[in-house]
Amino acid sequence: MIDHTGIGVADVGRSAYFYDAALGALGMRRVMQIPENVGTDGIGYGRKYPVYWIDRYHPHSAKQHTAFVARSRADVEAFYAAAIKAGGTDNGGPGQRKPNYYAAFVLDPDGNNIEAVYRGD
């Protein structure tokens, strides 16, 4: 289980638009936002507390892969559709990857590999 993770992004506004849509499809929302005047302009997403952060990255930082827990196959499909519509790039559409692992992969606007996975059924 992921407690929290974070990535650096080139354009916080563009990425916030993407993650508002993609993570909104999984029932997540912005739960914390740090003003730029405190050294960053980070946004924390989650259901109750921030588990996923975006903030302005340093040019030499590595791209990330993060998997989010989905509540159903329908959530995986909603995540994928919302992420693509918000500017993401297909990196593996919704489908069964192995027994009890239904997932979809999207590259966010900065090339980070974002996954939604449902382990039920």
Regions found by a protein language model. Name each.
Residues 41-80:
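Long, continuous compositionally biased terminal/linker segments
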Residues 7-50:
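Core segments of cupin and vicinal oxygen chelate
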